[in-house]
Amino acid sequence: MINYIKKSLSLSAVITGEMATDDCQRLESLKNRLKGQFGVPVGVHMTGIPLAISTLLTIFCYAMLQVSVWMLLFRLLGLPEFKVMMGVFLAAVVYCMIVMSTMFLTARGSLTGYKLHISVITLTGLMSIVYFIWTWISLLFGSVENYTPQITSLLGLGFFGLNIVWMNTSVFYRSIALTLHNRVWRKQLKIENRQMAGLKR
């Protein structure tokens, strides 16, 4: 079901391990292997769009449960509800900073960044599942005047599902292979520049 996600994680782990060398020939060989993974040099996977779409879907999924969660939290703590929007805003800023950081790390070919990106998506997805169950139980066993929580919980679950489907495509997999290729390339260039600087001395 999530074969491409597993493949991209496995590829990232293998390349990260094999990058631990200063041999430019081995790095060139790694680059060539990765070129075979991301395929044709022109396509959506070359633009960074796949990772950006995944990030946006994660943010949309999180946004769907924000207001209801903060309303519930403020009621439990006995805080005035007019301050809810302040809580929503601050939490959204922190969340966006976290998810954007994982996106940029993933775009640089970082295995840790990619694992964190998947962890953030998984955690957000679990929150949306809990929110979905809670809102629909409230609808079935309680008196509900406003159906907004049920609609937003359904949308949140939809965004989470779309994100998983999107990350499990060959386009997304090839975009991860490209980020790894570029990371290897950057390391190769650094080594070559260092060697050139040594020769000039």
Predicted regions and their residues:
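Juxtamembrane "helix-exit" motif on the non-cytosolic side of transmembrane helices
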Residues: 63-77, 108, 130-141
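Short, highly charged, low-complexity non-transmembrane loops/tails of multi-pass membrane proteins
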Residues: 5-10, 171-201
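Loop-to-transmembrane helix junctions at the membrane interface
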Residues: 100-126
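Generic alpha-helical transmembrane segments
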Residues: 58-66, 80-101, 123-127
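Short juxtamembrane and helix-loop transition motifs at transmembrane-helix boundaries
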Residues: 47-53, 73-85, 112-115
